Swiss-Prot record:
Record EC number: 6.3.4.2
Name of the featured protein: CTP synthase
InterPro entries reported in the protein's UniProt record: Class_I_gatase-like, CTP_synthase, CTP_synthase_N, GATASE, GATase1_CTP_Synthase, P-loop_NTPase
Residues given in the record as CTP binding sites: 14, 147-149, 187-192, 223
Region (Amidoligase domain): 1-266
GO molecular function: ATP binding; CTP synthase activity; glutaminase activity; identical protein binding; metal ion binding
Location of the Glutamine amidotransferase type-1 domain: 292-534
UniProt organism field: Geobacter metallireducens (strain ATCC 53774 / DSM 7210 / GS-15)
Gene from which this protein is expressed: pyrG
Further comment: CTPSs have evolved a hybrid strategy for distinguishing between UTP and CTP. The overlapping regions of the product feedback inhibitory and substrate sites recognize a common feature in both compounds, the triphosphate moiety. To differentiate isosteric substrate and product pyrimidine rings, an additional pocket far from the expected kinase/ligase catalytic site, specifically recognizes the cytosine and ribose portions of the product inhibitor.
Regulation: Allosterically activated by GTP, when glutamine is the substrate; GTP has no effect on the reaction when ammonia is the substrate. The allosteric effector GTP functions by stabilizing the protein conformation that binds the tetrahedral intermediate(s) formed during glutamine hydrolysis. Inhibited by the product CTP, via allosteric rather than competitive inhibition.
Length: 538
């Protein structure tokens, strides 16, 4: 079958939910047996988000092949089986970089390089490359219609209908219908103006997904359809959902996927949504109660920084049929003000990845609490490194143990710069990135969780466990349960005399899905559930 293209745009405001809408549509089309590719186009000039502050951009999602990408790719991977790569996310910076390189090589034969056709052709080329082998390619355009940065991308996708034929391209626009509480009314004018602006560019949307607090009444749908020149059935309500994994079911109920396959002339089987129905049922009515997890981090004022992590913990709850509540604790405050009983009523503690020295001592305090009080603990990336520092200081007696990232002249650098990182000066795209194999030791927490001795996980770091201190740490009871054999790099550490204490250098949250929870999060939440049971009996 010739590949069909669905372009998803957004209007009125940013962060309106284009990523979730795209991912949910991908899930629905896969449930019909179609092969789906997913892609995000970002209009900013950065080459990628790898050097951007989490407070600016939120989480940086890492793919198997080492791309540092937009967090929406995390939604795509969680909702679909699409294998994402460096081609799945590109920016204005990458497009211009590629075009300028071609011009310098003389590829344009002395011609004047312009936005049209050269930039738009490069955008179309990147879209087509990622779509190879797919029945349907879903392409989300970042930003908001009306942004000057988005214009070349919108022009490129406008040209697709002429290039590929009307029956092979569909435009889906996600827009806002705000509820004005003082007036007690939903307002359609922002949507009308957003679509008007899109049509002025030359794109007529086929389907509108209207984000709103409550369902749109029939007369309002009819009004939007009339003013925006779409069929009334093409006006889809996306009211605020109790759980984000209920969104595919809500969109299916309104016939979104039926309309898409009809407009694109695709014959498919009826969708099998039983797995999604099971997930939503477990989220709404968990049989085994609840657990409370403390996330001790640096970026807690913007929880989007930990998007995949929060979702992976939810997946662990789905696997254990329990509800997961997250308590975000600022590690800087713990550092300056102490724990103050903040961890006394939690069922498990997690210290996530991060960069910079600020808040590290607060994380170490939380880790010591978890280790000594036998509270289930999970350390990821920097969290694993700080667990090693805590163990070195408080169990091995290495008083000045720390990471050379923060104190280059510390006496006991139990965490140090990786050998291949020495001499690296450029910041962008130079970390240890992407999937690497990890060999596990029999009988460990990790081995029991995975049920295998060989696994592959995704990384994003420059610093590692210092093997010069391996002997003393192991002699005092630290378990090295996972290594990267090729470089003899320590990937997983555990504390044996503990219900569940594990730190990993990689980011397992990037591979967790609601339909297939990651084994480490599954067993971590199981340990939290068990700990809660013991606390309630005490």
């Amino acid at each position: 079958m010739k590949t069909k293209f669905i372009f998803v745009t957004g209007g009125v405001v940013s962060s309106i939910g284009k990523g979730l809408a795209s991912a949910s549509l991908g899930a629905l089309l896969e449930a019909r047996g179609l092969r789906v590719s997913m892609q995000k186009l970002d209009p900013y000039i950065n080459v990628d988000p790898g050097t951007m502050s989490p407070f600016q951009h939120g989480e940086v999602f890492v793919t198997d092949d080492g791309a540092e990408t937009d967090l929406d790719l995390g939604h795509y991977e969680r909702y679909t089986s699409a294998r994402l790569s460096k081609r799945s996310n590109f920016t204005t910076g990458q497009v211009y970089f590629s075009v300028i390189e071609k011009e310098r090589r003389g590829d344009y034969l002395g011609g004047t390089v312009q936005v049209i056709p050269h930039i738009t052709d490069e955008i179309k080329h990147k879209i087509l490359e990622n779509a190879k082998g797919a029945d349907v390619a879903i392409v989300e355009v970042g930003g908001t219609v009306g942004d000057i940065e988005s214009l070349p991308f919108l022009e490129a996708i406008r040209q697709f209908k002429a290039d590929r034929g009307a029956g092979n391209v569909l435009y889906l626009h996600v827009t806002l219908v705000p509820y004005i509480k003082t007036a007690g009314e939903l307002k359609t004018k922002p949507t009308q103006h957003s679509v008007k602006e899109l049509r002025e560019i030359g794109i007529q949307p086929d389907i509108l997904i209207c984000r709103c607090e409550k369902d749109l009444p029939h007369d309002m749908k009819a009004k939007i359809a009339l003013f925006c020149n779409v069929e009334e059935k093409g006006v889809i309500t996306s009211a605020d959902a109790e759980h984000i994994y209920a969104v595919p079911l809500a969109l299916h109920k309104q016939g979104l996927d039926d309309q898409v396959v009809d407009k694109l002339n695709i014959w498919t089987k009826a969708p099998d949504l039983a797995p999604w129905e099971s997930v939503v049922e477990k989220l709404r009515n968990p049989l085994k109660g609840e657990v409370h997890i403390a996330i001790v981090g640096k970026y807690v004022n913007l929880t989007e920084s930990y998007k995949s992590l929060a979702e992976a913990l939810t997946h662990g709850g789905i696997a254990n049929d329990c509800r997961v509540y997250l308590r975000y604790l600022d590690s800087e405050k713990l550092e300056s003000e102490g724990l103050g009983g903040l961890l006394d009523d939690v069922d498990a503690i997690l210290v996530p990845g991060g960069f910079g020295e600020r808040g590290t001592e607060g994380k170490i305090k939380a880790i010591e609490y978890a280790r000594t009080r036998k509270v289930p603990f999970f350390g990821i990336c920097l969290g694993m490194q700080m667990a090693v520092v805590e163990y070195a200081r408080n169990v091995c007696g290495l008083d000045n143990a720390f990471s050379s990232e923060f104190r280059p002249d510390c006496a006991n650098p139990v965490i140090h710069l990786m050998e291949e990182q020495k001499g690296v000066e450029r910041k962008g795209g130079t970390m240890r990135l992407g999937a690497y194999p990890c060999s596990l030791s029999k009988g460990t927490f990790a081995h029991r969780a995975y049920g295998s001795l060989d696994v592959s996980e995704r990384h994003r770091h420059r610093y590692e466990f210092n093997n010069a201190f391996r002997e003393i740490l192991v002699s005092k009871g630290l378990v090295i349960s996972g290594i990267y054999k090729e470089g003899d790099l320590v990937e997983i550490v555990e504390v044996a005399d503990h219900p569940w204490f594990l730190g990993c250098q990689f980011h397992p949250e990037f591979k967790s899905k609601p339909l297939n929870p990651h084994p480490l999060f599954r067993t971590f939440i199981a340990a939290a559930l068990e700990h809660r049971g013991k606390r309630s009996q005490a």
